Design a protein with these regions (language model features):
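Intrinsic-disorder-associated, low-complexity terminal segments enriched in Asp/Asn/His/Tyr and depleted
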Residues: 16-19
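Gram-negative bacterial Sec-dependent N-terminal signal peptides
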Residues: 38-57
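Active-site-adjacent core segments of small-molecule enzymes
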Residues: 58-369
Length: 369
């Protein structure tokens, strides 16, 4: 590639194939804070597969990762410039301050005690940029911690303690079972029933959301990482954890009357108004796994009796004034991790990297600049 010297390697991460790592490069002549704003060229480098230019298809037949993105597009449509999941959202910024408890668990510089710049994105679940803020879907809190030495820690958190699939191969069928039949304009109820009965664990997140209050604010809802991660400290002692962000404002949901009277778009305006008056903050905690806890199935919660430790404080003190912003070209890949933190062998976690890159490549040509 003739312009290789202009390429910047943004991140590298494992996949659910043990012999395969994926790295993301962006090649361009114009960058802002390391992220490309014009003429992007993505290169997906997979060990054993050579270099694959995106957005061209990885192969003539859709790969499992492409099938996931295709299923999202089948359900929600191809919305120009929008993320295929969490399409409706807003960029925000702030900082994180780790504490001594965090340092005891991980050697990551995120827990140094100094302010770490954070780029955030709040979102409404699903692939439609016109989704209602009153819908019973997940709310998302995606984060990128910009650490010393060029390290990056990314995560994609949701407002439910469980993920919606237990295995990667359930992802595309889950979406397809909910996709409208062209003849009726609605999902086939028999197809959906059959899928749910064959995959009961995929109904757990929806069951949780059906009983949870609809969030009144992005800043008044809990967010979970859902997957397990391995923290390793300076003494080379390891501990598996799942993390959780608890709003300092408390959890606040809409009343029945508010659900009737509120518009479909209120979360972004509410967040801007809130942060303009005073920063929004979250307590970052981790639940410590014990030997019997499930590390590889994100649809299974750990017992409430497990010890939970506060490892720092996240503060959001800025919200983008409009579309676009510093978060638009970030994948928020949950296996883009710093030293001192490793992914578990959860196949769902490891399978999320490649679809994130494919999704990014498809929306980049139309992304807000």
């Amino acid at each position: 590639m003739s312009n290789a010297k202009q390429c910047k390697k943004l991140q590298s991460w494992p996949t659910n194939r043990g012999d395969m790592n994926v790295s993301l490069q962006v090649c361009s002549t114009q960058t802002v804070k390391g992220f490309i704003v014009k003429n992007p060229l993505l290169i997906l480098i997979a060990a054993g597969f050579g270099s694959l230019a995106l957005p061209a298809h990885v192969s003539a037949q859709a790969s499992p990762a492409e099938a996931q993105v295709n299923a999202l597009e089948g359900l929600f449509g191809k919305n120009a410039g929008a993320r295929r999941s969490g399409a409706k959202g807003v960029c925000a910024s702030g900082y994180f301050v780790g504490n001594e408890a965090g340092r005891a668990l991980s050697s990551s510089t995120a827990f140094s005690g100094s302010r770490v710049p954070v780029i955030a994105r709040f979102s409404v679940g699903g692939g439609s940029p016109k989704a209602s803020d009153k819908g019973r879907t997940v709310r998302g809190l995606a984060l990128q911690f910009d650490l010393p030495g060029g390290e990056s820690w990314q995560m994609a958190n949701v407002s439910a303690p469980v993920f919606f699939v237990a295995r990667p191969e359930q992802f595309a069928p889950f979406m397809q079972a909910r996709t409208a039949d062209p003849a009726t304009g609605k999902p086939d109820p028999e197809k959906l029933k059959a899928f749910n009965e064959a995959n009961p664990e995929t109904t757990l997140q929806g069951a949780f959301l059906s009983k949870a209050p609809i969030p009144a604010s992005y800043a008044s809802v809990n967010y979970w990482g859902v997957n397990a991660f391995e923290f390793t400290n300076a003494k080379n002692e390891s501990q598996f954890v799942r993390w959780h962000f608890l709003p300092e404002a408390g959890t606040v949901g809409l009343t029945d009357e508010e659900i009737k009277t509120m518009p479909d778009d209120f979360l972004v305006a509410e967040l801007r108004k809130r942060v303009a008056a005073s920063p929004a903050a979250f307590n970052f905690t981790v639940q410590l796994a014990e030997r019997s806890d499930q590390l590889t199935d994100p649809t299974k919660v750990w017992p409430n009796s497990r010890k939970e430790v506060s490892i720092g404080r996240l503060v959001i003190d800025g919200v983008a004034p409009g579309v676009g912003g510093s978060c638009e070209l970030i994948t928020f890949n949950p296996v883009a991790l710093p030293k001192g933190i490793k992914p578990s062998q959860d196949p769902v976690l490891l399978a999320r990297a490649t679809p994130y890159v494919i999704s990014l490549s498809r929306r980049l040509p139309d992304a807000p600049k």
